Amino acid sequence: MTKKEKILIALDDDLTSKAVVKYVGRITSGEKNLAICLLHIIPPLPPQLREFRGSEDAKMEQQLDRELDVKCARWTINAERAAQALLRKATTLLTKAGMPSHSLETCVRQSVNHEDLIDDIFAAAKEKKCQTIVVGRSSFSWLKEVFHRHVADELVRKASGVTIWVVE
């Protein structure tokens, strides 16, 4: 019996992700020994939900703390719902392309720190035993290019023991 190859597709909510899923669906259509894991990493909580102004009054401090907990929970629930919707759309695109649904899985994680995104993707690939990671790369204006790093470029630079596909 041939071992199944596993591909991890790292998705975000931009148009490039849809192109990535369509591309993978097109080139893997009909493959029997292939499994795909669709990954979306929820960004860290926004700073206003991580920082707490506090109070000198203990009761007020507890109240503010509870309110912050509720806001954090609400933000996380909304982010997870958006992630699930994104993953459902990607799953639909892949099944329409001929990928059997039993060969697909989804994974949602929340990042603690923006700088950990690359490591989070590698960790998910290792945990899910994926040999290939697929990411999209959209073009930036020259000015944004100076100040912004491409996730795809960082993955390629840091990759070891895993294949990286970059779809532009």
Say what each PLM segment does.
Residues L8, A35-C37, E105, T132, ...:
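A structural signal for isolated positions on well-ordered beta-strands in alpha/beta enzyme cores
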Residues S17, H114-E115, H148:
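A conditional alpha-helix N-cap/helix-loop micro-motif detector
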